[in-house]
């Protein structure tokens, strides 16, 4: 039975094994300790079903035999319910897209947010529309329209349900805030103002501290704990990344939060950070923008097209670099990457923070900090008193929860590129997904050991879900179900 232990999330009489009701599961921590998936699943082994899905990066949300996902086409946002046993579409609804956006990053998508449900109401969120609440059969309960945040990298946080409330990260909007709505009516209960915060992809995280129900939200160099009752700020920690994608997680009185962003590196370090370790970019091209053009400007027209760019973070953010939006990158747009630009306020770091206290608890409660092997997007995983991190390039790190002492650091998985999906724990194993489509089964231990690897041959942005010892993975074009 789901109970309020460290978190006060979704109260229900459903067993934890039969639901994965929101981003990162029943307790929003990405763990399914009593389940076990096949160790040898692949595209042609232990595959129960595979169905096509619309475009979208949201993760599957599951309540017993129903799966909820979102997606979109050029005209409409879509929210869909599937039969978990067969993949059959049970119902599908849509809302109009008022404006087609071109994002600065290839990972930008108008349907990033994972649905959330308590078994009676399902919450869908689209930043360019608002909040939509239905019952499990798709009947509309209410809507709450919001002004779009309109981030050039899209919106990436997910709505969270806790104690009959819905919490939504609104950082960077005209109403920059943490928004709390009544789950049953959609009416605003409170809004904690967060002025001067830039957009972040951090999902709110419910946590119980003594007799207080808190909501943790990170962004713009801070992690703030708010009262879930009235939005009052209880405590905060500073010295974190200015732009953050991971979400916090807590276990045994320790909150783990932080990440990595290019905003906090410059010059040679910044250039090297935007290329994959296995790329064909020469060492000379990493030091000199002219050499880079000489290497990749195939038609020698003094400009680089998207096709000419090597696979890299730079290619993923081509629209961001192409400031005049003419479809090409010229030297004046590329060369600034190589300069020692001032770093944005904040720093790349992962912190272990003791819960408790009030006000600024940075000096009093930060137990440890980690500066290597930091994730850009994937949230930290706490399992069996160890913290696991999955970083760009296919590097895994494992540290002790209470001390931050490394058990292993930056161990290679063997597949480079980005790691957008957050790692999850299932029984004695971890599941880690590479953006390139590889899915790793790793031993949940103090030593890095890869048990199995399969390749879905499609890009992966979404975090997997596990229910009844079956794993559900959303790739670029399909949703997959694996199990016995």
Describe the function of each predicted region.
Residues 1-8:
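Bacterial N-terminal signal peptides
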Residues 13-484:
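Noncatalytic, solvent-exposed loop/strand surfaces
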């Amino acid at each position: 039975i789901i109970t309020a232990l460290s978190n006060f999330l979704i109260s229900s009489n459903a067993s934890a094994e039969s639901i994965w009701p929101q981003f990162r599961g029943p307790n929003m921590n990405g763990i399914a300790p009593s389940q076990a998936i096949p160790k040898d699943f692949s595209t042609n082994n232990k595959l129960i079903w595979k169905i096509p899905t619309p475009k979208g990066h949201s993760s599957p949300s599951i309540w017993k035999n129903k799966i909820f996902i979102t997606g979109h086409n050029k005209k409409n946002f879509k929210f869909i319910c599937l039969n978990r046993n067969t993949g059959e579409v049970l119902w599908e609804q849509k809302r109009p897209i008022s404006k087609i956006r071109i994002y600065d990053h290839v990972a930008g998508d108008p349907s990033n947010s994972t649905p959330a449900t308590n078994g009676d109401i399902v919450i869908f969120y689209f930043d360019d529309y608002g909040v939509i609440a239905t019952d499990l059969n798709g009947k509309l309960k209410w809507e709450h329209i919001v002004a779009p945040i309109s981030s050039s990298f899209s919106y990436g946080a997910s709505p969270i349900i806790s104690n009959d409330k819905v919490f939504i990260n609104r950082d960077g909007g005209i109403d920059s805030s943490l928004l709390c709505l009544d789950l049953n009516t959609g009416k605003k209960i409170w809004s904690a103002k967060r002025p001067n915060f830039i957009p972040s992809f951090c999902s709110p995280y419910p946590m119980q501290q003594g007799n207080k129900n808190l909501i943790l939200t990170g962004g713009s160099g801070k992690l703030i704990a708010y009262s879930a009752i009235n939005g009052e700020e209880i405590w905060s920690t500073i010295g974190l990344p200015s732009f953050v994608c991971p979400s916090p997680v807590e276990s045994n009185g320790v909150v783990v939060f932080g990440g990595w962003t290019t905003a906090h590196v410059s010059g040679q370090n910044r250039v090297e950070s935007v290329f994959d370790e296995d790329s064909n970019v020469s060492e000379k091209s990493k030091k000199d923008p002219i050499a880079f053009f000489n290497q990749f400007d195939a038609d020698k027209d003094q400009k680089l097209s998207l096709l000419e760019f090597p696979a890299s973070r730079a290619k993923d953010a081509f629209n961001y670099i192409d400031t005049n939006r003419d479809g090409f990158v010229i030297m004046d747009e590329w060369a600034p990457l190589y300069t020692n630009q001032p770093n944005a306020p904040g720093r790349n770091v992962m912190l272990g923070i003791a819960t408790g206290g009030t006000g600024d608890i940075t000096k009093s409660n930060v137990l440890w900090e980690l500066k290597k092997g930091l994730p850009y997007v994937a949230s930290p995983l706490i399992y069996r008193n160890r913290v696991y991190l999955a970083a760009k390039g296919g590097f895994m790190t494992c540290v002790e929860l209470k001390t931050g002492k490394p058990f292993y650091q930056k161990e290679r998985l063997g597949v480079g590129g980005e790691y957008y999906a957050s790692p999850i724990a299932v029984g004695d194993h971890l599941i880690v997904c590479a953006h390139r489509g590889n899915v790793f089964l790793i031993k949940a231990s103090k030593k890095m050991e890869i048990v199995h690897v399969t390749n879905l041959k499609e890009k992966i942005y979404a975090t997997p879900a596990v229910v009844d010892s079956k794993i559900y993975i959303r790739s670029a074009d399909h949703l997959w179900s694996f199990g016995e």
